[in-house]
């Protein structure tokens, strides 16, 4: 039990460091932790960079707004690492995942935020510009797979009015 208390104190200190960065670095660090701890599957490096760059409700994704993975890791104070072999991001240890799961207050509306982010991406001009056909080219659409597969899963866990509006916008038959 003592080791668990030591780890809890360590994680609280590290999270305090992330928040103490203030401003954009604190926002990015906490957003990365939210995405990794609440995603429905491990995220690829490019997926998390895109997810963090999306502004909910925006129709455009500016490539200049997409952070580098090194910038995101820097904001996380050593709590996140990249598995080089499979190019996914993960928390440094399973006990940190357990810690985050037992502290849901750290991430206000995590699943609704994630659903809104996925739906914003799917409703964006970037995703709509994808031409469907026999030679479907997904390069440059690095968040498409995750957002199209998991927006509903996040929405089922935690529904928000905004997510519902974005889902109805996506499914609007008049736009197809």
Question: What is the role of each PLM region?
Answer:
Residues 1-176:
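Leucine/isoleucine-rich amphipathic helices and adjacent mixed helix/strand linkers
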């Amino acid at each position: 039990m003592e080791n668990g208390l030591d780890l809890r104190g360590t994680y609280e200190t590290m999270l305090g460091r992330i928040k103490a960065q203030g401003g954009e670095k604190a926002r990015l660090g906490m957003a990365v932790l939210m995405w990794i701890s609440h995603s429905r599957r491990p995220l690829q490096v490019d997926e998390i960079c895109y997810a963090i760059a999306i502004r909910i409700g925006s129709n455009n994704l500016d490539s200049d707004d997409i952070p580098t993975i090194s910038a995101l890791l820097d904001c996380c104070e050593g709590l996140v690492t990249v598995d080089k072999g499979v190019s996914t991001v993960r928390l440094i240890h399973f006990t940190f995942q357990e810690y985050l799961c037992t502290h849901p207050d750290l991430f206000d509306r995590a699943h609704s935020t994630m659903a809104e982010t996925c739906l914003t991406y799917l409703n964006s001009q970037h995703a709509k510009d994808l031409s469907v056909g026999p030679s479907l080219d997904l390069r440059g659409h690095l968040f498409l797979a995750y957002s199209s597969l998991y927006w509903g899963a996040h929405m089922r866990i935690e529904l928000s009015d905004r997510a519902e509006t974005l889902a109805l916008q996506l499914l609007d038959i008049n736009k197809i």
